[in-house]
Amino acid sequence: MCCRPDTSWEKENRDFYCPECAGAIHWAPVVFARISKAGKCVGEKFASRYYDAMGFGMLMYIGDLLPDIASASCADHTTILPFPLYNTVVFDNPDNAYSVNADGALLYSCSTLGCRKTLEEAICKSSVLTSLRTGDIVAVELSEPCLLSSRSDKEKVVAATFCDNDLFDFKIIW
């Protein structure tokens, strides 16, 4: 479990200009929830009461710093959590799918099946270590971080959809 600073959150779907120190950008798809009720040590039975909306996004990491350095996750504009969020009932339909493409090629796809359970487990685990506050975001990586782009790419277009709606569409520029 790690925390990311607010400056890492990209809210406006802008292109990402890679820092000079980076030779590669890694990424991981995430499902996330907005905390709607403050709490500490939330039990599994009650976790669903602590969030009111969910979404899908991605986390990017400075690849040269992976896997053990916390600063790999602190670069500005590397937390892509698009708003507005979806009502939690949307995640009860396994036909709804999240997909991420890079330069038109499918990188990742998943259904909503099991996402609520995964998030609720994360809410329980994180609330043991830290107090949850209204408005906090809890995100869970759906797969291990892997290479998204490297300096040799010069430019890469990353786009994602959920429920046939565009979530984000931006360029990684080296």
What label would you give each PLM region?
Residues 1-134, 146-174:
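Catalytic-core "active-site belt" of small-molecule-metabolizing enzymes
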Residues 140-145:
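Short acidic beta-strand-loop surface patches of small beta-rich interaction domains
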Residues 137:
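Aromatic sugar-binding surface patches on proteins
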